[in-house]
Amino acid sequence: LATARPWPNYRTDYAPLVNFAKEKKMPVIAANVPRFLAAHVAKNNASTEGIAEQYLQWLPKHTYAPEGAYKDKFYAQMSSPAAPMKMPPQRLAAVYAAQCLKDDKMAESIAAFADAHQNMQILHINGCFHSDAHLGTAQKLEALHPELKVTVITPLERKQKGEKPAGDFVVWFDRK
């Protein structure tokens, strides 16, 4: 963590899971592409050109930005009045490519782990946008490994009760 840029909520949302896994001697992998590589793609018109050779190993072997439901959902989210910033279409396309780069790397990492650990259940934690409705990472993992049973569990705060659940299972919680 000393050389990484973990999410601001790492200590509260991720560290307890990582520590639990360590305590129980369960394997943990960092499935995602490093943030600076996704940022490079977003800032460089969806291109990986210019990434130093030593970091290329951290990129997915294959990446694609699919048309359809995921793209529509992404563009709607990023174009909504609540979006953090307004972006011109070309920039939005590059940011979508960076999002897909993350999905591809996570799917490849999970698939590689599944190949190396036959019959082991895998718990993958990601932001809900990456797997809601079996899109994003879930969709790409299902394409890489159609024989895997992928189940999406969506945590929702009780005050979001009216929202349509986007997972196979929903865990309702109250924020303290």
State where each predicted segment sits.
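Compositional signal for N-terminal targeting/processing segments
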Residues: L1-K176
